[in-house]
Amino acid sequence: MLAFTLRFIKNKRYLATLAGALVIIAGLTSQHAWSGNGLPQINGKALAALAKQHPVVVLFRHAERCDRSDNTCLSDSTGITVNGAQDARALGKAFSADIQNYNLYSSNTVRTIQSATWFSAGRSFTVDKKMMDCGSGIYASINTLLKKSQNKNIVIFTHNHCLTYIAKNKRGVKFDPDYLNALVMHAENGKLFLDGEFVPG
């Protein structure tokens, strides 16, 4: 009888421990969603919270390319489509609801400039050709923009190969961004850290 009682007590303790662990895991899962590529998903609210702690850098791939689509071009064939422009405008509106204070940059291609224009809804932005060159030097270029922006949040319209490079270099994951997908980084003590993939909403 004593042995049965001890086993029963141990089982109750085990079940209590297991239940507690499951509660913790459930809590973590509800707070941190993950993309299929292994990057944490960061929505607007999480981005706003991060921006209160450090300057954030959000790097967007440009909107839908005209020369790779059957959809109507906005204007120049090397730019974006009408659908892409509308998507960029909707994205900019949603983004600005959570992050109002940021400086905007674009690489020097028609598609990124048009994407930034429609995203900004009239906000001025700076064209920087270095945002086209994506390799180990991209971090120095981003830090230069942060200094110019006096460590404000910055948004950059760039290209898929830039986002792919950063995801692989910083977290060792394969990231194949679609149009207007984005990565979130933050600056701390002069270093850049990749936090995850921006997911509007």
From Swiss-Prot:
InterPro entries: His_PPase_superfam, LipoPS_heptP_Pase. SUPFAM superfamilies: Phosphoglycerate mutase-like. Pathway: Bacterial outer membrane biogenesis; lipopolysaccharide metabolism. Gene3D superfamilies: Phosphoglycerate mutase-like. The keyword Hydrolase applies. Its EC number is 3.1.3.-. CDD domains: HP (cd07040). Residues 1-35 form the signal peptide. Keywords: Hydrolase, Periplasm, Signal. Its main location: periplasm. GO terms for cellular component: periplasmic space. Catalyzes the dephosphorylation of heptose(II) of the outer membrane lipopolysaccharide core. This is Lipopolysaccharide core heptose(II)-phosphate phosphatase. It comes from Salmonella paratyphi A (strain AKU_12601). The gene is ais.
